[in-house]
């Protein structure tokens, strides 16, 4: 299974985040799954790639040309796919993924997982969309989705397939039910 993970090229200031990223990467590698991610060697992106590779897993990076020109790509990847721009990168990462996980991240992470959430809610994508809600990071987004339902702008049926989790065990449970 290809697990597309969205996360930042920064590490953030919460040590638990780095640990959770490394834990997921190790599990992906050890479980025989494959990682699809943004391709960078920096920050949390670099951490998940290293953890997956060190655990024997395959890692596909998807990076736009301008990042490659800046020499930000991870050198040890199983495969590096270079795209024209960020839009093409998002499309490719979705096409490659069987499941989608977003760690806490910045505006780029939010943009990427918002597109996945939209496709899942429209049933254009039949795959789990998982937000890793470490230390309540995504509570605001969770409340916004609930408010959409409350105001009649969405429905529980539309939001099926969107999950908020606290740890790796919950991710494993979702994947076990979905596949």
Residue ranges: model-predicted function:
Residues 104, 114-124, 145, 149-152, ...:
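Short, well-ordered alpha-helical segments in soluble proteins
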Residues 39, 63, 83-84, 103-105, ...:
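Short beta->alpha connector loops at strand-helix junctions that form conserved
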